[in-house]
Amino acid sequence: TRKYTGEPYINHPVEVMQIVNTVTDDPEVLAAAILHDVVEDTPATIMNVRIGFTPRVAELVSDLTDVSKPEDGNRAVRKELDRQHSAQASPEAQTIKLADLISNSKSIVEHDPKFAKVYMREKSALLEVLVQGHPTLHKQALDIVSSYYNNRP
């Protein structure tokens, strides 16, 4: 289940795919959108993705998978490593990352305002490097982050 909402976990990957589908109908990009968290959140490995899907889908999922490990340092250090990884990602992977940010931000701001302060600061920094992602989704994500900062008490 999803943290905060108790919804079935699959709802988040489906929502990310639906957001991506507003800007592309490329089946490999949509498959990668569904799979974007599979390596981080399940026992699946990138090798499993390579075996079960096309090389392009596997490459996109690899681009979307955080590279940091707990031993790399504190959260700020780890998120910076992941941000640098995202900066090198393909435009398609960055588009999926933007959709993920859009999907997650709504839930976190609503259900965990204390953590949202940290999370939205991280996402603001991430948006600075997701410049190759689809401009429509980049604007939506930027609007969410801006709205958060403009509406804080």
Feature roles, as predicted:
Residues 1-153:
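Active-site helical microenvironments for divalent-metal-assisted chemistry
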